[in-house]
Every structure is written in C-alpha cells, then in structure tokens.
Design a protein with these regions (language model features):
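Cofactor-/ligand-binding subdomain signature composed of acidic, glycine-rich
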Residues: 1-44
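Ferredoxin-type iron-sulfur electron-transfer modules in oxidoreductases and energy-metabolism complexes
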Residues: 28-44, 73-75, 81, 91-95, ...
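N-terminal glycine-rich phosphate/pyrophosphate-binding loops that anchor nucleotide-derived ligands
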Residues: 33-75
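Conserved phosphate/anionic-ligand binding catalytic regions in large, soluble enzymes, centered on
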Residues: 47-65, 166-177, 350-362, 398-410
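Histidine-anchored nucleotide/phosphate-binding helix
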Residues: 98-112
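Short amphipathic, charge-patterned alpha-helical segments
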Residues: 105-107, 257-274
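Hydrophobic alpha-helical positions that pack around
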Residues: 130-256, 272-274, 432, 459, ...
Length: 483
C-alpha cells in the first residue's frame, strides 16, 4: 500500500463529525499555522512542490505568491468545488467523507493568504454535499475555529459555502468568480488575473478541493517531507477517479510515480479489465484530455514505461501523449465505440459552452452535429476532415480553455482511431443496426429539430413567457391601484 495523505482516516466510523475528526488530529494544522508567519506557510507550500489538482497542475505555492499584497485591499480564498468534468468524482468523495479536512484546509490556507473572508463554491447538483459542508462549517464556528479572534490569536475568518446552478463553465476560475458575485458565469479576459483583480475586485486565489485538503498535511509535516513523496516535479499523492470497463472502479489515492500498468492491472487499484477483455483505450485525466490507445497507455512513443505523473503522461505532446488532468481515469475495452464516445463528449461541451466566444459557441455545435452524423451512419469521408478542421479553428481561439477541452478529444480520437470513423462511413447499415441506435430514436428526432431551427422556436417560447409575466405584473399592479 502506498502513502496516504488524504484518505488515511477515511474509513474511520463517523469521521465526518467534528468529535471524531478532532480525535484524529483534526485542526492541529490551524493551531500551528496561527503561530507561523503567513509567508512561512507559503514557503512551505513552495518547498512541497504541490501542484494544482484541478487539472492544470500549476504550482500552488507560486500561485499563492502572485496575490497582490500592496494594494491594501481585502484578500479572498475561493475553493473550486464545482466538479463537473465527466469521469471525475474524487472531490465529491472527499467532501462527503472528510468535510472537516476541507474546512481545516480552508482555514490554514486563508491564514497563509491573510484572507478574512473565504468561500467554497460547490456544484449545483451536489445539494447533499452542500448540507454536509454547511454542518461541518457550523461545527467549526461552534468550536472556535471560525469567526472572530480564532483561538485567541487575533485572527478573524468567515467561511461560507455557496451552491452554483449546475453550469460546467463555472469550473473555470473567473467564471466561478462571476457566478459567486451573482452574475452570469462567463469567463473573464485575463489579464488581470484573479490574484490581482478577483472576487469583488479584490485579490483572490482559487484552488481545487484536493489541493486545499493537502495543505494541513504540509503545514504539519513540512514541505520537504511532502516533496519526498512522488517523483521529480510530480510530488505527493493524487486522487484518481477510476471508471469504465475495469473490475474495481472507485476513488484511489496513489503516490505519483507508479506505473500506469500497475494502476490499471493491480488488484490494489483497478484490478484489471472486466471479464478479462482486451484493453482498447483510456482517457487518463477527464473528458477534456486526449484519449490514448492501448499501445500508448503503458508505454510512451519512446518505448519508455509510462508513469502516473504530470510529465510522463504528457510525454510526446498530444501527438502520442495526454494529461493527468483532473484524474478522471476512464478505461475502455474492445467493445466500446470511439466514435460514439467522441459524440458523447462533443454533445456535452456544446451543451456547456457559455456562448461568449464565437469559435466555441459555433464550433462545439458543429462538432456535435458532425459526430452525430458519423455515429448514426449518415456521415461521409469529408466529415472526418471537417471535424479535424473545426477543432483546429477552436483550439487557442477562446477566452477560456473550454474550447480547447472540446477540441482535444476530437483531435485525439481522429488521430488514433481514424479507421473507426471511416468504418462508420463505409458501413452505415451496420452502424444503424446496432442496438444502442435503435434504443435512442429521440436522438434522430432531436437532430431533425435542430435542423428545423429549434433555437428560434425556443426564443419564441421565452418571449411568450416574458409577455405573460408582464401581463400578470400589470394585472397585479392594477388590482392594488383599485383597492
């Protein structure tokens, strides 16, 4: 068994309650942090080599050091708990099982940043997790870990948990800030970065749930000890959400540096393939990263062993590599259709695009429509080249990375599995005869409705609703005037 930093006590009965969590050393890092200089905490995080666990992998200590301390404006820490990436569910698991560890991490990190008002922004669909966190925060207030003059230190901190409305785009830090301010969740143009102009125009740091939950261990044990775990610049442990055609799906905490083959095939982790079918492909970091075929999953293009690290997973660039991303590890056996998988992802990104940038708004729509045609036996060879052209025009031409996230899976699928796309063109009748196509006639209807200008019909419905609201409001005011 590897080192456990976050999940060491996860199976302790009632660990979600304050009393049990405190008995296991909970909130000790807050006591220690209150006696340390804030800059010393930041330096320990820098020494640790901790990288953001939300997907980008940016060094956390460096991100903290960017925060504006000269303006004199209030600073904020925001926890990004808007976990919406298909294939990723580790943050939900952490918040369900260890809510007080997140609260402790928020307090310790806020001390380091000298923030006095911090927020946890949680995904709209996680309402039960919202209630779990709210209870943990109330227990922290009741026991003197939040509020005025925490433990007689003179340090004040208020912590709030806020629920989003279910928009994937709000996982992007500036869109999250916009939503937290009560606005539409559209990403901002950067610069200025949130570390300078963030929440309410104040310096703000946005970190992922897992990132923040690593901080108490670093404060208690030191950055150097954390850096000893892992390999190279990939230090510490990482939570992986394993799913797909494997025997043991679930959330696993691994030491960065184990081999991908060990993670997939070992009984300690994924347990190998279901019914011992051949491995076909894997999405190693959530739906937004390039898919890897079986021949590039365990070995790199240089015939080196591929490791569960940021560097090894990206070896060869997107031509022969991928990203560890958010840790959404989806495994496919030989029964899975890559064209169908690509269509599913394209449909998701089209639905979740905020529409602010034309390349993303229009491009994701075309990606969905063209992949729909190919998946359902209505495509032609030109459609494959059209997909390639569309994704190239999206990538790098949008305000936020959602456009890139929509383009990369399509590019990788065509690069590694073009023969499957061509099969869908050459044998449309075989594609149409598949059971999953017959079971979903609504998808054909939906596609036809889109071609028949469904957006215009929806606009007319919204206009009608608006007119009804105006009429009812006028009627109510007229009644008040009469009486």
């Amino acid at each position: 068994m590897g080192k456990k930093i976050l999940l060491e006590h996860v199976n302790v009965p009632n660990i979600h309650t304050y009393e049990v969590y405190r008995s296991k050393g909970g909130y000790d890092s807050v006591e220690k942090a209150l006696k340390m200089a804030p800059n010393d905490i930041v330096e320990e995080v820098k020494k640790s080599g901790l990288r953001g666990r939300g997907g980008a992998g940016f060094p956390t200590g460096m991100k903290w050091s960017f925060i504006d301390k000269k303006s004199g404006r209030p600073r904020h820490l925001v926890c990004n708990a808007d976990e919406s990436e298909p294939g990723t569910f580790k943050d939900r698991y952490l918040m369900e099982k260890l809510p007080h560890l997140l609260v402790e991490g928020m307090i310790t990190s806020s001390i380091a940043l000298e923030a006095h008002l911090s927020y946890i922004y949680i995904r709209g669909e996680y309402m039960w997790v919202y209630r779990i966190l709210e209870r943990a925060i109330n227990e922290a207030y009741a026991n003197g870990w939040l509020g005025k003059n925490i433990k007689g230190s003179g340090y004040d901190l208020d912590l709030h948990v806020t629920c989003g409305a279910g928009a994937y785009i709000c996982g992007e830090e500036t869109a999250l800030i916009e939503s937290l301010e009560g606005k539409r969740g559209n990403p901002r143009i950067k610069p200025p970065f949130p570390a300078v102009v963030g929440l309410y125009g104040n310096p703000t740091v946005v970190n992922n749930v897992e990132t923040i939950m690593d901080i108490p261990w670093i404060v208690m044990n030191g950055g150097d000890e954390f850096a000893k775990i892992g390999i190279g610049k990939s230090t510490g442990t990482k939570l992986i959400s394993a799913s797909g055609n494997i025997k043991n799906p679930g959330v696993y905490e691994i030491e960065l540096g184990i081999t991908v083959e060990e993670f997939v095939m070992s009984d300690e982790w994924c347990g190998g393939m279901q019914t011992d079918r051949p491995l076909k492909a894997c999405v190693p970091g959530g739906s937004s990263v390039p898919i890897l075929p079986a021949n590039l999953l365990f070995k790199t293009a240089k015939d080196e062993t591929r490791l569960m690290t940021y560097e090894s997973m990206a070896d060869g660039g997107f031509a022969t590599g991928s990203m560890i991303g958010s840790g959404g590890f989806i495994v496919y056996d030989d029964r899975q259709c890559i064209v169908r998988n690509t269509w599913n992802f394209s449909r998701f990104y089209h639905h979740e695009s905020c529409g602010q940038c034309s390349p993303c708004r229009e491009g994701t729509g075309w990606l969905e429509k063209v992949t729909w045609r190919l998946e359902h036996g209505y495509g032609n060879m030109e459609d494959i080249d059209l997909l390639w052209d569309i994704q190239r025009k999206i990538e790098g031409n949008t305000i936020c990375p959602l456009g890139d996230a929509a383009a990369w899976p399509v590019a990788a699928a065509i690069r590694h599995f073009r023969h499957e796309f061509e099969y869908h063109v050459r044998y449309p009748e075989k594609v149409k005869d598949r059971k999953h196509f017959e079971a979903e006639p609504w998808e054909k209807v939906k596609h036809l409705m889109e071609l028949l200008y469904l957006p215009i019909l929806l606009d007319l419905v919204v206009l009608a609703q608006f007119c009804i609201m105006l009429f009812l409001n006028y009627k109510q005011k007229l009644c008040l005037f009469m009486f």
